[in-house]
């Protein structure tokens, strides 16, 4: 055998031998895909009310901390729009997540399935946006107060804001779960 191009002969590499050794998937792999999907859907069914419950807890804490933030003239939460906004949105978030948690655990359907899924998805997104909006509006005011004097009023305001941010994170995760549920339904 002559080599007209005068090139080295090509040797078989480990990658090529590994590719030859791999076999076609067995018919049983389809069932494992189905069971993986069932496990994923079961995990989402369990995680969604848990994230809403966590949001309920943090929203309630933000509400209670902000309401109790009264420390005399110039140090009352109700003298500042930003803090009143955090209070109002934490009340809305508490009511929304309490209603969603009650609806889930009572197994009652207030709407048909399609409407309920749409309400879950849109409600989670709207309330999550309101939570982060309220927190982001109050952060600059709290930072300005901390530059002048760091006291219990600013600490309470900062803790209420952080609870609102934690509630946002929990509700944003719940919105992801709601979006997944919405995308997997066949009525879309």
Curated annotation (Swiss-Prot):
It is a multi-pass membrane protein. Residues 24-34 have a biased composition (Polar residues). InterPro entries: CASP_dom. The chain crosses the membrane at residues 47-67, 85-105, 121-141, 157-177. The keyword Cell membrane applies. Residues 1-46, 106-120, 178-188 are cytoplasmic. It comes from the Eukaryota. Residues 68-84, 142-156 are extracellular. The keyword Ribonucleoprotein does not apply. Residues 1-34 are annotated as: Disordered. Keywords: Cell membrane, Membrane, Transmembrane, Transmembrane helix. It is found in: Cell membrane. Residues 1-11 have a biased composition (Basic and acidic residues). It holds the Pfam family CASP_dom. One of its GO terms (cellular component) is plasma membrane. Belongs to the Casparian strip membrane proteins (CASP) family. Homodimer and heterodimers. This is CASP-like protein 4B1. It comes from Arabidopsis lyrata subsp. lyrata. The lineage of its organism: Eukaryota, Viridiplantae, Streptophyta, Embryophyta, Tracheophyta.
